[in-house]
Amino acid sequence: MPKVGMEPLRRKALIDATISAIGERGSLDVTMSEIAGRAGVSSALAHHYFGAKDELLFATMRHILAELTIDMRRALQSAKSPRERVSAVVAVNFSDIQFQAQTIAAWLAFYVEAQKSSALRRLLKIYARRLHSNLMSGLTGILPRAEADSAAEATAAMIDGLYIRRALKDGVPNAATAIALVEDYLETKLGERQKQ
C-alpha cells in the first residue's frame, strides 16, 4: 500500500533527478530507470507517476519554468522603478537556481528537444513571451515602445547566448559576470537614449 502524502515528494525527487541526470550527460539521453535510481524510487513508480519519459521531461521543464516565474514575481514586486524592473529580470535569469550547470544543461537539452516536441516547443514559447513581457514592463517606462521592444529582444538574446556559452564552458564563468555584461549593454542602450 502506498504511503499517503509521498506522491508530491517522489514527483519532486524524480524531477530533481531528471535535472541532475541531464546535467551530467548534457543531453536527454537518460533512461527512466536511471532517473528513478537517482531519485531512490523504482522505475515502475516513476512510470506510474509520469507515464513515459517524455511526460517526465515535460514536467521537469514546467518545474524549471515555475521556479523562474515564482522568483520573477517576487523580484518584480520589490522593484521600485522601471530600471529596477529590468535589472530584476536580468538578475533572476542568472540566479543561483537558474544559472547552475545542471539547470543550464537541462535548458539547452530542452531547446534541442523542442525542435521535435510540440509540447516542449509550446513551453519554450511561453518562456520567451514571459521574458519579453517582463523586460518590456520596465523598458516601456524608459524608452519609446519600438525602442523598448528592440532592447528587450537584444537583452533576451544576450541572456540565451550567455546560457549557451556557459553550457559550452566557453566564456562567461559565473552569474555575476553574466549580469554585468547584460547590465553594461542596457546602460549603453539607455545612455544613448538619454543623449538624444
Curated annotation (Swiss-Prot):
Residues 31-50 bind DNA. It comes from the Bacteria. Keywords: DNA-binding, Repressor, Transcription, Transcription regulation. GO terms for molecular function: DNA-binding transcription factor activity; transcription cis-regulatory region binding. One of its GO terms (biological process) is glycine betaine biosynthetic process from choline. The keyword Mitochondrion does not apply. Residues 8-68 form the HTH tetR-type domain. Pathway: Amine and polyamine biosynthesis; betaine biosynthesis via choline pathway [regulation]. PROSITE patterns: HTH_TETR_1, HTH_TETR_2. Repressor involved in the biosynthesis of the osmoprotectant glycine betaine. It represses transcription of the choline transporter BetT and the genes of BetAB involved in the synthesis of glycine betaine. This is HTH-type transcriptional regulator BetI. The gene is betI.
